[in-house]
Amino acid sequence: MKKQNRLLSLILSLFLLLFTLVPQSALTVKAEGNSEMAVHFIDVGQGNAILVQSGGQNLLYDGGDQSHADLIISYLQEQNVKNIDYMIASHYDEDHIGGLVPCIDNFSVSNIFGPDYVHTSNLFNNFMNTATANAIIVQYPSVGETFDFGTGSFTVLAPNGISQNSNDNSLVIKLENGSNSFIFTGDAEETSEQDMISTGMNLDCDVLSV
């Protein structure tokens, strides 16, 4: 989403007191409450990579580009990740799935979610073939579907249809844990924003990742 985002008014800086800098150029946000959830924003340059840990489970949202694959794998290993319960490709641009392909080979992956469209790149084909080689079926969740995760859950907010614009195909999720909530947008742009508004779902959140 664009920085002048009108969809959500709450901004990340309101929660700077929750942030703890950790090695490997990552930022960790710990959700408050009785049940802890740690959200690691991993610095992969232009792309996106977010690790969420809760209740012994792990969720990886995007993996940056291919040049950051070793960093992603190393960081996950440092966090004692052995199984990725949910791997989510927001969309299939290189700077979002490049680091996911080797993660499929290096970790036990239970579920892979992505938007239901075909990208023309060789990397997309490699991503799909690697999933198939590891006996994983890529799933395409619908808007409004909710999945239990750790001590919380996440709900799919977008895409509500497929666009010619790859960014607007981003699989957007809202992650909730107790009174804390996060929205991960991939590269969703204005068309996707308007679609999310039209659904009438609750789009308030504590932390918005854009």
Model-derived features: where do they sit?
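Non-globular, low-confidence helical/coil segments that flank catalytic cores
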Residues: K2-L7, L17-V210
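Acidic, serine/threonine-rich, charge-biased low-complexity segments
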Residues: I11-L14
